[in-house]
């Protein structure tokens, strides 16, 4: 993994998080980060005293770069990004207090002089952030976004125009592009989030904040797993990578005595999962915990939760930010083995083309296919 960012007479050591699970060809910043850093350095002569707001910094590169400028406000929905920022500030001998770190549920009320946005993969998240910005920007605020050129579509620019004002773009450089926007001082939008839909049989109303995976409908993998939920009455269950919490919610419906731990690395996902328990089964709220974590790191960090769980349900993602990877699923499976009791079960749904069966067999010594269709398989492994 390339770790040294050298640009404009500055040099920083930057790691992706978790560093030990990264491919040697990956790095903690991209050409869009570099383009944004260069543009600001060459076009805004004095950053001292400016209120800087930073959104969607994948692994803390922007946070580190601007950390010496008046404690910029740094907002991300990703717990992994939060951990990466803390790691990279420490590696570069910069106090965490140099950055005002907040999650995506934070509504900024301080006025911004300069807003820097990495365009997220989910346009709904971008839309929510642009709406939120209406309360903290003025026509004098400089708003600059950066992203891969092929990810900046007409629909991306239309969101800036719709919610803020006049929008233009730069030329492409190293396959990245900048977006420049000026707030017109007039637009005040009502957020369309959370989006809501009903589950088929139980008719639960599912609320989904902007960055929740499959926020408009039940995703196919979860649909398959819902038909094969275990009997979990009076057992402790982890809904790992819970998203809006639809699996854990149905566990509580099927097994009223279950205790469910909802875990996700998205702050919006955890907030949505809690909202969905509160709205659909409020009497079960005291049987639930909601934890923002990279896989099960936060559950296992103290060691006291090892071997305490009966069942882990898992619908693993195969992206980290914009990178396709299997390391998240691998860590989820390893963490699941640690947190499960003797004879506890890991139950996984995944695309059939993925190598989950052999990975699980290496860790648990065996696996069983509970069900499968043309696209998905449900795998079960018992901890011995």
UniProtKB/Swiss-Prot annotation:
Q: Which reaction does it catalyse?
A: guanosine(1835) in 23S rRNA + S-adenosyl-L-methionine = N(2)-methylguanosine(1835) in 23S rRNA + S-adenosyl-L-homocysteine + H(+)
- Give the GO cellular component terms, alphabetically: cytoplasm
Q: What is its EC number?
A: 2.1.1.174
Q: Which UniProt keywords apply?
A: Cytoplasm, Methyltransferase, rRNA processing, S-adenosyl-L-methionine, Transferase
Question: Which EC class heads this enzyme's classification?
Answer: transferase
Question: Is the keyword Membrane assigned to this protein?
Answer: no
Q: Where in the cell is it found?
A: Cytoplasm
* A molecular function (GO) term: 23S rRNA (guanine(1835)-N(2))-methyltransferase activity
Function as written in the Swiss-Prot or TrEMBL entry: Specifically methylates the guanine in position 1835 (m2G1835) of 23S rRNA.
Record-given protein name: Ribosomal RNA large subunit methyltransferase G
The species is: Pseudoalteromonas atlantica (strain T6c / ATCC BAA-1087)
């Amino acid at each position: 993994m390339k770790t040294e960012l050298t640009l404009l007479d500055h040099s920083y050591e930057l790691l992706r998080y978790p560093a030990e699970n990264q491919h040697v060809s990956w790095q903690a910043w991209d050409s869009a980060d570099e383009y944004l850093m260069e543009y600001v350095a060459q076009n805004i002569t004095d950053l001292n005293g400016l209120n800087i707001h930073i959104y969607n910094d994948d692994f803390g590169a922007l946070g580190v770069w601007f950390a010496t400028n008046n404690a910029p406000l740094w907002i991300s929905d990703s717990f992994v990004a939060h951990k990466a920022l803390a790691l990279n500030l420490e590696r570069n001998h910069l106090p965490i207090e140099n950055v005002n770190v907040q999650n995506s549920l934070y509504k900024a009320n301080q006025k911004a002089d300069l807003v820097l946005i990495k365009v997220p993969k989910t346009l709904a998240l971008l839309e929510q952030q642009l709406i939120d910005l209406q309360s903290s920007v003025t026509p004098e605020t400089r708003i600059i976004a950066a992203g891969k050129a092929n990810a900046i579509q007409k629909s991306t620019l239309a969101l800036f125009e719709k919610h803020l004002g006049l929008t233009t773009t730069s030329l492409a450089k190293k396959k990245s592009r900048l977006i420049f926007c000026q707030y017109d001082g007039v637009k005040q939008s009502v957020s369309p989030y959370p989006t809501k839909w009903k589950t088929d049989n139980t008719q639960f109303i599912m609320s989904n904040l902007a960055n929740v995976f499959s926020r408009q409908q039940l995703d196919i993998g979860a649909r398959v797993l819902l038909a094969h939920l275990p009997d979990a009455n009076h057992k402790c269950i982890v809904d790992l990578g819970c998203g809006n919490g639809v699996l854990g919610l149905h566990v509580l419906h099927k097994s009223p005595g279950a205790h469910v731990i909802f875990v996700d690395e998205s702050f919006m996902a955890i907030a949505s999962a809690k909202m969905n328990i509160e709205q659909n089964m409020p009497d079960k709220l005291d049987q639930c915990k909601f934890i923002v974590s990279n896989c099960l790191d936060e559950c296992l960090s103290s060691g006291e939760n090892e071997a305490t769980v009966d069942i882990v349900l898992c619908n693993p993602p195969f992206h980290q930010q914009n990178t396709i990877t299997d390391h998240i699923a691998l860590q989820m499976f390893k963490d699941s083995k640690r947190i499960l009791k003797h004879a506890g079960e890991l139950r996984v749904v995944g695309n059939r083309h993925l190598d989950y069966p052999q990975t699980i067999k290496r860790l648990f010594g065996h696996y069983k296919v509970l069900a499968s269709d043309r696209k998905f398989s449900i795998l079960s492994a018992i901890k011995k």
